[in-house]
């Protein structure tokens, strides 16, 4: 394809932290280019999932192609690819950016630069994108445009002297953003090979069309009837239709080099078209795929069990359907003595886990119990083999374990200066080791290496509370480190409850065991017999509490009378309690399983 036909195409995405006004700016751009009529406009046009709307976050990538008549009289084709902003979805962001030549960096004029936008901006710069700074929310009384510019230059290190000040809410200066896109972001450059290469930016499942893939054609063209090959799996599929989003779905005869659009090829599930993969023609394939593709690895695991055992087949079906849209979700059947049948699910992070659980409950009307999330540990066995363990209940016997290694992450925290002491204290409590501190204007960048297990539970919430919401976090996995880890088991009346097992650092084992026993004591309802709650490491009991039995007053009917009569009744009651204790099962309520999650939140 010639460079002339590409000259008026601009592919760009928006990098922004959660709540900095990315989706609102996208709405304004769509409106200005006439993508939707005024009556069809609704807030957050591109966030199509109700959870995305409610939480004000973007989970899946979306795209929209818009014609724009610029001031120089030429019509440009703008392809805007929306990206998720949360740290859990950083791989999806890198794929969206790989499909662009430029990016708008949106910064809130009142809040300044946040860690997540820094991480994504570095990704954009590494991939050679032209980054255009945009300072949003200038209509706020607390907006400080000069400070925001200074922060962009100090923290990210790009020139912000010609940053565009806008208010996406009122629509002020949005036209200037479009002009900046046209004049500052370069058009796509033709590749040297003519063979088809298309990057899959995202895939989702449609009940009528099968998998719809959002693609950026790097070279060549795709048209209906072509036979495509997915390069990582080697499978072939016939194209049904191609087109673009305007943001409604519009069918086109072909997608050419430099364009971004959708492809349907009756693929049955998103694993057949993984994000970041390359599409090529089956009859005339490209010599090599586009760089950067990687399998998504779940980092956090939790058990999901239906409250009602009859819902198990429905849960399986719901997870199968969700997986069609969510390539990062992994699950396998699991049975637990305490909870019955369910699934062990793998997620990218805590936000991903919450969203999946919320979608299962809301869209499929399921009542679910989730166990405490755990990370994947590496276990070196005495025979020299290494296993990955995502469930504490599956830890091999102590005499077979040489060492346990936990995942370590590198966390970058950006915070205003006054909260630095609180944040360092929090990181030290979480067994972190400091890597460095950089002072960048009024912001401070603190780098720590932390055990992922400490971050998974409540680190993000605690970070927000010690910094009054101002600190922001970005993290990535670095390595596995060996340490003195033990498994704490909970025994109720001598029976081990596998769903409550935890893996903890030996120095924390006693404290966590005591806290867990105390918490369980509050949550397990009183029975007709004493319930012993114990925490154990191996065969050693490290903590114990007892839920006292309820007693019926068996002497109430004895008015006076011989003491032996009373003794007989009390003995009979005691005998009954003893028998009950032998056969009695203790029902453990749902809250007790969540106790593990809330232990640190006291």
Curated annotation (Swiss-Prot):
Mainly localized where? membrane
Recorded GO terms, molecular function? GTP binding; GTPase activity; guanosine tetraphosphate binding; ribosome binding; translation elongation factor activity
| Gene3D superfamilies (UniProt xref) | 3.30.70.240, Elongation factor 4, C-terminal domain, Elongation Factor G (Translational Gtpase), domain 3, P-loop containing nucleotide triphosphate hydrolases, Translation factors
- What range(s) does the tr-type G domain occupy? 7-189
Biological process terms from the Gene Ontology for this record are: positive regulation of translation
Q: What is its EC number?
A: 3.6.5.n1
Q: Name one Pfam family in it.
A: LepA_C
Membrane topology, as annotated, equals: Peripheral membrane protein
Localization of this protein: Cell inner membrane
Spell out the reaction equation it catalyses: GTP + H2O = GDP + phosphate + H(+)
Q: Does the keyword Repeat apply?
A: no
Keywords per UniProt: Cell inner membrane, Cell membrane, GTP-binding, Hydrolase, Membrane, Nucleotide-binding, Protein biosynthesis
Could you state one GO cellular component term attached to this entry?
A: plasma membrane
The text of the family note is: Belongs to the TRAFAC class translation factor GTPase superfamily. Classic translation factor GTPase family. LepA subfamily.
Q: What does this protein do?
A: Required for accurate and efficient protein synthesis under certain stress conditions. May act as a fidelity factor of the translation reaction, by catalyzing a one-codon backward translocation of tRNAs on improperly translocated ribosomes. Back-translocation proceeds from a post-translocation (POST) complex to a pre-translocation (PRE) complex, thus giving elongation factor G a second chance to translocate the tRNAs correctly. Binds to ribosomes in a GTP-dependent manner.
What name is this protein filed under? Elongation factor 4
Species of provenance: Stenotrophomonas maltophilia (strain K279a)
- Gene behind this protein: lepA
